[in-house]
């Protein structure tokens, strides 16, 4: 790595009961600094109820190729979605991280009108702009149509519209990543908003109604070319992690829980012979526990699941 070490880190501050606005905290990470490890600046949002989760930059290596048309884009703005509000904040970190401030607010109605999506989740800067995955479709409860990915302009931050042209069987969404030299994307599934906004729905989980598929896309054509079902009992296929070397055509996805035995698992996907393949390559067993010490959902299993949520 040739880049200089980061001097400031950014993290999110949440209000669990929505009584206060969420915020962005700037932390000094310079060794030897008198404020090392401390919050040195906070950007408090003007609204309550946003529920921050993931966030990302406006620019990165995926967006700086000369072929993208913005090879000199500056990594300057943080894009922070509100998962519950469907609002997006653009934070300017210049002229200095300790002076970070709100640059633009994209209100939910604009996202609804231009994309038909809601509940923005993951942010990745990429070859066509800023890619934002969503967990909800249209309508009040986010179930009027499938969720997906939309594109924002990486300089003006205008919402440009849906990314997908042909989604195939994809009807849920969670994470996504790509292999730019090979021109494909991989996406995963979690749930629709009624299945997570007020907590997990036990009946849906035990009935295997959460996401359990991986979708493979032609990145430039924006078309779903293959879908692989991991098996209905493998509930909540979440974080997608490709190989760091972009010429290698494999990656990983974590699955939260197997509803037959509560184990978590990690799966490897790869492309061979023009087709994608997926195989379970690691498992994490549930931890035995006394039934009377467990919530009702787990008492019949007599165990606590590891709940793989990130890899």
Regions found by a protein language model. Give the residues of each.
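Conserved small-residue
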Residues: 29, 33, 40, 140, ...
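Beta-propeller domains
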Residues: 2-73, 79-107, 141-144, 153-156
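Short, conserved, GDST-rich strand-edge loop motifs in beta-rich repeat architectures
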Residues: 3-4, 11-18, 65-76, 80-81, ...
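Beta-propeller blade signature
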Residues: 22-29, 94, 145-157, 203-221, ...
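Asp-box/WD-like beta-propeller blade repeats and closely related beta-sheet repeat scaffolds
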Residues: 92-180
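Surface-exposed loop and turn segments in beta-propeller and other repeat-based domains
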Residues: 38-59, 103-116, 162-171, 224-238, ...
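Structural signature of eukaryotic scaffold interfaces centered on beta-propeller domains
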Residues: 1-5, 51-74, 116-127, 176-183, ...
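Long, internal scaffold/assembly segments composed of regular secondary structure
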Residues: 186, 208-254
């Amino acid at each position: 790595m040739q880049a200089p070490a980061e001097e400031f880190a950014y993290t999110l501050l949440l209000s669990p009961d929505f009584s206060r606005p969420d915020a962005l905290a700037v932390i000094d990470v310079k060794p030897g600094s008198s404020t090392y490890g401390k919050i040195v600046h906070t950007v408090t949002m003007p609204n309550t109820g946003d529920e921050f989760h993931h966030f990302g930059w406006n620019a990165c290596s995926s967006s700086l190729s000369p072929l993208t048309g913005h090879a000199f884009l500056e990594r300057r703005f943080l894009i922070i979605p509100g998962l519950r509000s469907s609002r997006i904040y653009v934070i300017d970190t210049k002229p200095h991280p300790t002076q970070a401030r709100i640059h633009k607010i994209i209100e939910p109605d604009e996202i609804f009108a231009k994309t038909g999506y809601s509940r923005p989740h993951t942010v990745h800067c990429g070859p066509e702009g800023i890619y934002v995955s969503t967990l909800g479709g249209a309508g009040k409860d986010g179930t009027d149509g499938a969720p997906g990915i939309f594109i924002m302009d990486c300089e003006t931050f205008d919402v440009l519209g849906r990314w997908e042209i042909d989604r195939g069987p994809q009807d849920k969404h969670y994470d996504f990543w790509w292999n730019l030299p090979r021109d494909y994307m991989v996406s995963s599934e979690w749930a629709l908003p009624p299945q997570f906004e007020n907590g997990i729905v036990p009946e849906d989980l035990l009935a295997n109604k959460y996401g359990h598929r991986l979708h493979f896309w032609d990145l430039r054509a924006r078309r779903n070319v293959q879908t692989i079902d991991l098996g209905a009992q493998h509930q909540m296929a979440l974080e997608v992690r490709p190989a760091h070397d972009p010429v290698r055509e494999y990656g990983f996805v974590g699955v939260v829980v197997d509803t037959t035995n509560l184990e978590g698992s990690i799966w490897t996907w790869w492309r061979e012979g023009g087709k994608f393949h997926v195989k379970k390559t690691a498992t994490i067993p549930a931890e035995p526990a006394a039934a009377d010490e467990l919530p009702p959902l787990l008492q019949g299993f007599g165990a606590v699941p590891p709940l793989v949520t990130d890899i």
